């Protein structure tokens, strides 16, 4: 196979050759930044004047209420039939790219390996530019063989009547070429390990089995896990029994399960009696929460009952949960700022601050930064602001926002179960504001259908501040602010029927002769 060299970058040359032969390709790289720069390099070599692509690039640009520099970068690439794809993009943008690649409008996608996982997006060529990625203190490490198989599995499109597909690995030298051949083409894939070996997963499953009455005793639990991949792989089941016994002890201590005996029993004795979940344990299981997280939330809420809390108190609590990991990391230049915010909110926090010498202190500071970002969103700062100030991409922020909403919903439910009515309203308000990204003053307006934070702020600035104002405001003014259809819909939502004025007819005095 002969590829014309039109640049100094082999992956760019192969991508351009793919377009020249009327095919599509996925270019796999190891970082989000590389995905973007590679897409840009390919697009700069193309001269395309396609109306459909121009319209598509405009759609990409308007995917967010306020386009970021990343949106503009992507839009420019898409106008040439090239795109980048990674977790930092908003979901709507990723969906647009995937759909239009399937349609054949987008010819090249430069992406991270996440695209190969769980997305059916075949291409004629799968180009593996990077088979190594940064592994922390270990430096650059070869990716797993299983991951390589996922990527090469994208090559070939039976639905497009391709007889074959091409998977191309790029090696920097002859020795690396030999290593790639041995490791990936001739090598064996790694073993698959059970997720139950991860303690949070095991905890959740144990509580779930007890809650659904699938397992009513420690013996039934052990019998179940003996038949799992986890039990088979672990080998020494005595060790698994020790782990399960410890987890049962934790669940009992946290109030999520109880035994038939009212008096205290040891961890060994607990296996001889029946296990039952409590109503609180049932709710934790239904919420799909890790029981450890649920206990952490409940402990934090008990502290909240004893002090004056703010929205920041609950945002920082949410940011401390395992489910939000990895958190937004504090950069060196941000330490002073983050510590200043910590000092300002110290008396309102419901999560205990560790010692600065504790290994958990960095994570604690990261939770403060994450809470700051959530609070900025609630203060109606847009995605562009978050990207510029904190280098947080819309896609990543969107994922964290969804997780935080789930944790806050779970917090609400646990507060209800425990009758923590004094703080329930504050938790609900924090969740609503975070979900909608609004200041407190906009809450009444955003409760109306089809009114988001941008429209609500526009109404507020023009004197329409609550439902009462929506009732009072003239339909003409409302139409000027929101458009005719939405203005009439809003009036209908509050129970007011407005008769539409026929086209060509005006209401009121038409001239001096009518005075």
Functional labels for PLM-detected ranges:
Residues 203, 208, 245-254, 258, ...:
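C-terminal helical accessory/scaffold domains
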Residues 430-500:
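Compact, charge-rich alpha-helical regulatory domains located at protein termini
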Residues 1-36, 83:
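Conserved interdomain linker/interface between the two RecA-like ATPase lobes of SF2 helicase motors
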Residues 108, 115-132, 166-168:
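A short beta-strand element within the Helicase C-terminal
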Residues 214-235:
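Short acidic, hydrophobic short linear motifs in intrinsically disordered regions
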Residues 501-515:
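Acidic, low-complexity intrinsically disordered tails
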Residues 144-181:
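Conserved segment of the helicase C-terminal RecA-like domain
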Residues 28-108, 137, 141-146, 226:
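Conserved C-terminal RecA-like helicase domain
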């Amino acid at each position: 196979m002969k590829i014309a060299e039109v640049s100094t970058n082999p992956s760019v040359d192969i991508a351009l050759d793919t377009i020249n032969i009327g095919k599509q390709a996925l270019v796999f790289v190891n970082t989000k930044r590389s995905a973007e720069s590679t897409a840009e390099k390919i697009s700069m070599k193309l001269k395309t004047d396609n109306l459909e692509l121009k319209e598509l690039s405009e759609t990409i640009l308007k995917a967010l209420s306020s386009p970021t520099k990343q949106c503009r970068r992507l839009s420019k690439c898409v106008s040439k039939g090239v795109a980048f794809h990674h977790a930092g993009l908003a979901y709507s943008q990723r969906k647009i790219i995937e759909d239009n690649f399937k349609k054949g409008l987008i010819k090249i996608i430069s992406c991270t390996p996440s695209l190969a996982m769980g997305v059916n997006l075949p291409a004629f060529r799968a180009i593996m530019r990077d088979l190594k990625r940064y592994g922390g203190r270990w430096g650059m490490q070869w990716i797993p063989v299983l991951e390589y198989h996922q990527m090469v599995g994208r090559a070939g499109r039976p639905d497009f009547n391709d007889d074959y597909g091409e998977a191309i690995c790029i090696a920097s030298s002859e020795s690396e070429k030999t290593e790639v051949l041995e490791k990936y083409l001739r090598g064996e894939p790694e073993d698959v390990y059970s997720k139950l070996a991860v303690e949070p997963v095991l905890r959740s499953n144990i509580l779930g089995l007890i809650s659904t009455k699938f397992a009513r005793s420690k013996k039934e639990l052990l019998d179940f896990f003996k038949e799992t991949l986890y039990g088979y792989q672990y080998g020494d089941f005595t060790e698994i029994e020790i782990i399960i016994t410890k987890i049962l002890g934790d669940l009992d201590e946290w109030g999520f399960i109880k035994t038939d005996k009212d008096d205290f029993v040891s961890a060994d004795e607990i296996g001889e009696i029946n296990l039952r979940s409590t109503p609180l344990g049932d709710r934790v299981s239904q919420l799909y929460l890790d029981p450890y997280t649920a206990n952490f939330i409940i402990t934090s809420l008990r502290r909240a009952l004893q002090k004056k809390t703010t929205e920041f108190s609950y945002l920082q609590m949410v940011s401390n949960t395992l489910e939000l990991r990895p958190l937004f990391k504090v950069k060196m230049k941000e330490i002073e700022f983050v510590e200043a915010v910590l000092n300002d909110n110290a008396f309102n926090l419901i999560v205990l601050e560790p010692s600065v010498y504790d290994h958990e202190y960095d994570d604690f500071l990261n939770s403060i930064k994450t809470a700051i970002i959530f609070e900025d969103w609630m203060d109606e700062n847009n995605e562009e602001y978050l990207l510029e100030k904190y280098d947080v991409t819309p896609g990543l922020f969107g994922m964290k926002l969804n997780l935080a909403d789930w944790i806050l919903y779970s917090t609400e439910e646990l507060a209800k179960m425990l009758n923590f009515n004094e703080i329930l309203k504050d938790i609900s308000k924090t969740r609503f504001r975070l979900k909608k990204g609004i200041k407190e003053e906009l809450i009444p307006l955003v409760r109306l259908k089809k009114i988001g934070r941008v429209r609500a702020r526009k109404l507020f600035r023009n004197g329409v501040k609550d439902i009462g104002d929506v009732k009072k405001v003239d339909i003409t003014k409302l139409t000027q602010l929101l458009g005719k259809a939405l203005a009439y819909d809003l009036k209908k939502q509050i129970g007011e029927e407005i008769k539409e004025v026929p086209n060509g007819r005006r209401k009121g005095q038409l001239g001096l002769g009518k005075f």
